[in-house]
Amino acid sequence: LNRGFKLTGRLGEVMKESAEIAYSYVIAHLKDYGCDQDFFDMSMVHLHVPEGATPKDGPSAGVTMATALVSLARKERIKRPLAMTGGLTLTGQVLPVGGIREKVIAARRSKIMELILPHANQRDFEELPD
């Protein structure tokens, strides 16, 4: 049986670490999220970050990756157009990230009106023009 966690794509070291933290956090908290605690013991998770040859780096996708893993383990889709960002620690603390302005603009361009941002980035968001 092939199981574990595999990352592919042009990911920088910080993003790889962020993905590994998200995976470790979710495995440690499966019960808290109402998931089968053996789910990842029986599964191979392959996370591929596309976008051509453009390298990706930074901690901003930690919360998003953890959310995707919980969604997978619960066998429940995230039902609405949604954008999110935030760093994540092994204890589940959500960390602020940079580039809030650019991320909000990208979400709006994609017609995504619901965003989840770290609380610590609230001021960055409030300072944006409408």
Language-model-derived ranges and their functions:
Residues 1-130:
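Peripheral, non-AAA+ core regions of ATP-driven protein-machinery
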